[in-house]
Amino acid sequence: MKKLIIIIFALVSLSILYSFISKKEKIPKNITLIKVYKNKRIMEVYNKKALIKTYQISLGQKPIGHKQFEGDSKTPEGVYFIDGKNPYSSYHKNLGISYPNIKDKAFAKKKGKSAGGLIKIHGLPNGKGKIGKLHLANDWTAGCIAVTDQEIDEIYAATKIGAKIILYK
């Protein structure tokens, strides 16, 4: 009987602990700035100068260096803007990033190549959302920034087209 009471107490304690850990932080619906730190694999979202929340991310399969050409599997570096929102993406939902800019296009053209495009902040591939944070085990995108489906839901809802995004090394 004593063991049963201890087991029940442990289960209740774990349930309470889990409920505190799993509560979602509510973020205001006004993300004005996104900062991506590629080397740390984190993305910070801001309202003006106030940090709202930090997310762990996965990047392109070859994350070192600035994206220069279509198919190089790199994630861009520099200052861009959110230029689109797609709730029907192949990756749950996505926010478009304004890569390539004029400078990116000119560099690629000078080399006789395409700069590429379609760089996004997105969730997991449709039907794979249950893997959650396991996607962080390695960089797997074609140059995009990936978060969990739950995370893209809150980022998507709080970000307007035109928000600034700065991608650092």
Language model features with spans:
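N-terminal post-signal-peptidase region of extra-cytosolic proteins
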Residues: 22-32, 59-83, 102-107, 149-150
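Sequence-level motif detector for i,i+2 pairs with an aromatic at +2
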Residues: 31, 52, 77, 90-92, ...
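Bacterial Sec-dependent signal peptides at the C-terminal "C-region" and cleavage site
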Residues: 2-3, 12-26
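Short, solvent-exposed loop/turn elements at domain surfaces
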Residues: 44-46, 53-54, 64-67, 90-92, ...
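A structural motif detector for short, solvent-exposed N-terminal "entry" segments of globular domains
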Residues: 25-63
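Well-ordered beta-strand positions in beta-sheet-rich domains
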Residues: 33, 54-56, 79, 118, ...
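Exported/periplasmic cell-wall-interacting domains
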Residues: 84-169
